[in-house]
């Protein structure tokens, strides 16, 4: 009756054993360094305001409740982990499932495993070094190369991303078949050119850390005190994959509120639904999150590289098309 159902896992059993060993090694890396493992909710009362993230939601119907309550599946454990930092946990890490209502393909699955950790009193560069240590231990790779976003853009695109005028960026984007108008959002143009032109040319032989993204792409990172055009944000790339995204974390609750509000302004311009701002995160920031750097790393992609797999479903027990 059910013989034709595709019940088998998308990863073979040998791969699942290898994946488990890698995850155990990740845990050992942090416990050996005295970093506390934590667990936080997958469901949250607040979604994310970021215009580039699409989220899943569900309705919670409590007994005797007059109406249901919308809850959001987290795109990251970041907000809850920062509340723990404000409570005084010190350095923490987490391995968890996160959800993004976006594409599914060779590198993406709507549900995936994230490693996220926070290091109070680390600056961005010290955390970059720790990510490098982790990659060397898990992947047995060469030490990472580091370059600024500005340098990478100038080297491979041929223009300065911090000063190039919009018409120049539009012309370049069209050269690479991006259909856009002259009034296209500047960051959209930069992100397209970076992903299309720069990313394929870096991190092939060894991991590469790209740091100091434009201030307009700061997200939850601090703006550099040395150059207000850039944010204290970095990303790691290796073997054609974006592996990690890290920040010298913004801890000013007023600035964070302003950024959330600006996200909703941008959402209105793009005809996207408004998102309620996470007041609990702002309360934690106001109470006092220590000076901290944090990073999120895609575990499935890390396993892909470690085991030389080309598609993300090859390292997952069940991908979205077989869940």
Swiss-Prot record:
Record bears the keyword Calcium: no
Entry keyword annotation includes Transmembrane: no
EC code(s) of this entry: 6.3.2.-
Organism, scientific name: Actinobacillus succinogenes (strain ATCC 55618 / DSM 22257 / CCUG 43843 / 130Z)
GO biological-process terms attached to the record: lysyl-tRNA aminoacylation
Cellular component annotations (GO), alphabetically ordered: cytosol
Quaternary structure (record): Homodimer.
UniProt catalytic activity: D-beta-lysine + L-lysyl-[protein] + ATP = N(6)-((3R)-3,6-diaminohexanoyl)-L-lysyl-[protein] + AMP + diphosphate + H(+)
Keywords annotated in UniProt: ATP-binding, Ligase, Nucleotide-binding
Binding annotation for substrate: 76-78, 118, 249
Chain positions recorded as ATP binding sites: 100-102, 109, 242-243, 298
Native organism taxonomy: Bacteria, Pseudomonadati, Pseudomonadota, Gammaproteobacteria, Pasteurellales
Source taxon at top rank: Bacteria
Family membership noted in the UniProt record: Belongs to the class-II aminoacyl-tRNA synthetase family. EpmA subfamily.
Full protein name: Elongation factor P--(R)-beta-lysine ligase
